[in-house]
Amino acid sequence: MEKTCSRSVSLAAGFIIMLCYGLLYAWSIYSSPLGEQFGWTSALLGTCFTVILISFCLGGVLGSILTKRLDSRRSVMIGAFMSLVGYGLASTVTAESVWLLFAAFSVSGLACGVVYNATVSTVVMRFPDKKGFASGLLLMGFGASTLVF
């Protein structure tokens, strides 16, 4: 017999996951210090954010495929590992390796899309009677992350 948690626990866990992965939208907070430290222009950093958002969208597609083939737990674990790799790469960026910045945040954006898709689809599926409430609370967590962190 498979052990499952209550739907309210799933909603709370989903909110926390979205709160953590919403840092994607905090780019403007840490792009200025990056530009100052490495001497990069705001146009270059803006292009990097564009790459992040494109990767996020592609990650949503990948997340859909993974969640259908595997389950949501494994999809989130894969996304978490991808985040670890992406932010690990970002920690090694130097002024001369701007390509590494793009690569690192492409992986992080992909990871965010995977986790986003797996989390929203799973939690909303558990709330057939309150889909709007569940998805609204999750998206509130995603948006509130820039405020909290």
Locate the predicted segments by residue.
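Intracellular juxtamembrane helix-capping segments at the cytosolic ends
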Residues: 34, 114-127, 134-135
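Helix-to-loop junctions at the C-terminal end of transmembrane segments
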Residues: 59-72
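Small-residue-rich segments within alpha-helical transmembrane domains of MFS-like 12-TM solute carriers
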Residues: 22, 109-117, 143, 147
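Residue-level signature of mid-helix packing/kink "hotspots" within the transmembrane helices
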Residues: 25, 53-61, 147
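C-terminal ends and interior cores of transmembrane alpha-helices
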Residues: 81-95
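Glycine-rich segments within core transmembrane alpha-helices of 12-TM secondary carriers
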Residues: 128-149
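Pair of pore-lining "gating" transmembrane helices in MFS-fold secondary transporters
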Residues: 4-26
